[in-house]
């Protein structure tokens, strides 16, 4: 495998491989320096949503970025499947957020009204009454009083997406080094030199840090603040059954193989990714309020995983002031943003004339 390239990407999860996919399509040579299988990897614990609604309520530019990502997703997935032969079970028929509390529902209505205004009307949501949602989803009932619906929301199998991205990148010449840990990094005469603890030496014209929670340690080597922290989420999985849900919600979805996934937790637990009885019980209770049928199903699996969170919850896209040519990319929506990371963010990395303007996502916002 090569040790010199146009780009060295540090971190080979969904974010890193999505970026690599876009760079390779532009004709760049790319090396990926990846950690071990025991590292914390949000890509493997992902809920599988490609989701817009609820994001960017207080940051309309992020809502617009996410909405664009969802709109280009069908073409992204279709092309990736054709190029690799890997089936990606992706469904974009819209999605729901269910409400059991009138005050929360009213607040969400006001928030979406303001967000739609900020986006000049380009935010095609709607709210459904309890009778409307029951007509659309007969299994939804219990204490559900209504739901929001957004047409570009959807879901997929995240492991299939990860496999397809890895397959494409390998096919197009990605040099992927596994089980590596950075030791030193410097830049001389316009070229980055990265040395790992195993002695691997990589030279690259540009560097992309997409190492998830590893950015906290790796980022400062390139002059970044590396302000990321873990947030634990827990997921419950039922036995496989025949299809009973037409569309996913932000907390309940039926996967392509028939099981129902339930997830509804945001916990500050440090780097502890274990599941807990208290949270699993709470998640199950809340889900049954919305979908009583769940009480009749057997739970067969559960897991915890760590999200990658910035201080304000928004992505960070930043070029180092100290070492220009080094870029930090981090977000907690790597699945949702995969299409735009490949298609648009890669243009920003190469300095293309059609690159998006991303200054509001930079680390500079944390200095204010």
Question: Model-predicted segments: where are they?
Answer:
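N-terminal Rossmann-like FAD-binding beta1-loop-alpha1 element of flavoenzymes
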Residues: 5-32
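Glycine-rich, N-terminal phosphate-binding loop of Rossmann-like dinucleotide-binding domains
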Residues: 12, 54, 211-212
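Conserved Rossmann-like nucleotide-cofactor binding loop
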Residues: 15, 38, 214
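Active-site substrate-recognition segment that forms the wall
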Residues: 21-26, 35, 48-50, 85-91, ...
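Dinucleotide-binding Rossmann-like beta1-alpha1 core, especially the glycine-rich loop
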Residues: 48-132, 136, 286-288
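Helix-loop-beta segment of a Rossmann-like dinucleotide-binding subdomain
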Residues: 86-99, 124-172, 265-269, 324-331
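Helical element adjacent to the flavin cofactor pocket in flavoenzyme catalytic cores
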Residues: 148-198, 202-205
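C-terminal catalytic lobe of FAD-dependent flavoproteins
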Residues: 291-368
